[in-house]
Amino acid sequence: MDILKYAKERHIRVIPEIDIPGHSRAAIKAMNARYQKYIDTDQSKAEEYLLTDFADTSQYLSAQNFTDNVINVAMPSTYHFLEKVIDEIVQMYQDAGVELTAFHVGGDEVPEGIWEGSSICRTFMQENELTNIRDLKDYFLEQILEMLDKRTYRQSDGRTLL
């Protein structure tokens, strides 16, 4: 919050970024640890923000040489997690007295092979009449942009920055 206030005093606009669905290894690892913490006592709480399908057999290598840094966009818990993060960022801007005018969601560097081995993704694609992985990614980004629109500010999807 101090950074936001400091920037505002100097007429600098800070644009938050959640680079998704790729570049998400830290979030995935953190939510996997949360899952392990709660799975024996509260399955619902364990799965609340889960970002990965443990049965996914997809094989890929990201530009950063990771094989586990892309969130599963077919899981309701992924959207729940992103709503939580976005709402926390919105609240931080409000608390700092800074207008949130843009939001960057990334969308780049999603490696070939992602989601192909996820039965959750296959089922989701069938239910939503998506024909390929590109359609799934586009569907996800549209959902995120709608999520941001509901919070009344502009967004950027990694192809253009407002």
Role assignments for model-derived ranges:
Residues R154-L162:
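Surface-exposed extracellular loop regions of Gram-negative outer-membrane beta-barrel proteins
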Residues M1-R151:
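Substrate-binding cleft of carbohydrate-active enzyme catalytic domains
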